[in-house]
Design a protein with these regions (language model features):
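Short, conserved phosphate/pyrophosphate- and ester-handling motifs at nucleotide-, phospho-/glycolipid
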Residues: 38, 168, 298
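Structural signature of eukaryotic scaffold interfaces centered on beta-propeller domains
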Residues: 206-208
Length: 468
């Protein structure tokens, strides 16, 4: 099969991350992303490497028997969701199957390696679950009208105005529509990714699930030729605050960003209304959140994730960490550290993002926890500098997993038990092989779905040292 070949096939299965395996009538297998098991699809081969063909999806010729749900009106064009047409229980089955295959291919099956795969916990909310959205300004086609939303699937430039997005609630949709209407009416240009000309860049919206507090941050360039920016922003603030919401506005912000990269970068933020932060609650703790804070995007799902992790850590003995020191590596804003602090002597969190460390310290003080210590720095380097030795280690690395050299240093502590929380199963499978080769065994595994209708999945693993 050569590059440029156009063919059809039936999707046999979907492997993580979102890689459909389509089988042609001749028995050839082609990887086609954004597909669902059972679909008959048309594809064009765009890559052949090591005799493995990858194709771009051209058309779904026949739906899968799994597809029984009515999707969001933007589904298919929007690059956000992948499984919206599949009932939620089937989505969970698909994700569980994908993770089980990756883990068993890496370290063996449950029977071979002696671990327990508990299953998968679903999200408490299947729709309208996100507490944060980052919308982009642009157009739906070249020289088209202003759009505000998500990138079209497979496109860097074109956008879809997701005014009926189903993974956020009505307040998000109201804010998007109000913003688009206002700037369209005033003929304000968006920042073009190719020419680097224009004003409007991104709209960041956050809403606390528990408190209902909302902050909106308009991200723009500093190119204000042709209009009075102060008057424009005053009108924008008025447009937002005069609409009806189920939640309540805590702040309207304006961030300047002249970076040529298509990312939200803070080069200065001013408060147009209210405050630059709000509060969210998780498992009885309060967290102060700014527009750029890292925080799990599904608050109710995060409670399931962290409660499951806490059960893995403590087991049947709720006093097992009394008088002990816990390392929380890749600690982010310190959520797990603060949940564990009441049951241990001290928690030491290490995180490379300084803003997240500052937030962790502030949140620990907010929750009256004086036995949490947070250090800003690379885990690989910081581990050489910490004097306290851990009795237990919690790992919650970014998508790429743990640097092999850092794994070596972690293993050298020789702690009896660890918990690994992963947001990318492929990285997890790779890292587990290293831990098992160096004297640890996997005791139990559980998946938690934080992202319904997408292919993303969280996995929690309990590790136990075998050579003590």
């Amino acid at each position: 099969m050569k590059k440029g070949f156009r063919g059809t096939g039936t999707v046999e299965r979907v492997d993580f991350p979102n890689k459909g395996i389509a089988v042609t009538d001749d028995g050839d297998r082609v990887i086609v992303k954004n597909t669902i098991p059972g679909q008959k699809v048309e594809f064009v081969v765009n890559k052949v490497k090591h005799q493995r063909a990858e194709g771009r999806l051209m058309e779904v010729i026949e739906k899968s028997p799994l597809e029984t749900e009515e999707p969001c009106p933007h589904f298919g064009m929007c690059g956000g969701c992948t499984y919206q047409t599949v009932p939620y229980e089937k989505q969970l089955d698909m994700k569980l199957t994908q993770v089980k295959k990756l883990i068993s291919d890496a370290i063996g099956t449950e029977k071979e390696a002696g671990y327990e795969f508990i299953g998968i916990h679903g999200s408490p909310k299947k729709s309208e679950y996100r507490n944060k959205m980052e919308f982009s300004f642009g157009d739906e086609y070249k020289d088209g009208p202003l759009a505000l939303g998500m990138h079209k699937r497979g496109s860097f430039y074109d956008l879809v105005t997701v005014s009926d997005c189903q993974i956020v609630d009505e307040d998000f949709r109201t804010i998007l529509k109000a913003t688009l209407d206002y700037f369209s009416k005033n003929n304000i240009p968006y920042f073009h990714r190719a020419t680097h000309k224009g004003y409007l860049r991104h709209l960041l919206v956050r809403k606390a699930t528990k408190t209902g507090e909302i902050i909106v941050d308009l991200v723009t360039s500093t190119q204000t030729e042709g209009f009075n920016e102060e008057e424009l922003l005053a009108g924008f603030r008025y447009e937002l605050l005069t609409r009806h919401y189920d939640g309540r506005f805590k702040g309207v912000l304006h961030t300047k960003n002249d970076s040529v990269a298509d990312v939200v970068k803070n080069e200065g933020t001013e408060v147009l209304y209210g405050d630059s932060y709000f509060y969210e609650e998780l498992l009885g703790l309060k967290f102060k959140i700014t527009p750029f804070s890292f925080f799990q995007t599904n608050s109710l799902g995060a409670e399931v994730l962290y409660e499951t992790a806490r059960e893995f850590i403590l087991g049947d003995d709720k006093d097992s960490l009394n008088g002990k020191t816990v390392y929380d590596l890749y600690s982010g804003t310190g959520t797990i550290a603060q949940l564990m602090a009441p049951v241990c002597k001290e928690v030491v969190g290490v995180e490379i993002v300084e803003e997240a460390v500052c937030a962790a310290k502030e949140n620990a003080a907010l929750n009256g926890l004086d036995n949490c210590k947070f250090i800003a720095g690379d885990v690989l380097k910081v581990l050489d500098e910490i004097e306290e030795k851990p009795d237990y280690i919690i790992l919650d690395p970014p998508r790429d997993g743990i640097h092999p050299k850092a794994i070596g240093k972690i293993i050298e502590y020789g702690v009896e038990n660890m918990v690994y929380i992963s947001c990318k199963p492929t990285s997890l499978a790779r890292d587990l092989q290293i831990f098992m080769d160096r004297g640890y065994r996997v005791e139990k595994i559980c998946c938690v779905d934080m992202f319904p209708n997408t292919y993303h999945i969280e996995t929690i693993v309990a590790l136990h040292r075998t050579d003590l």
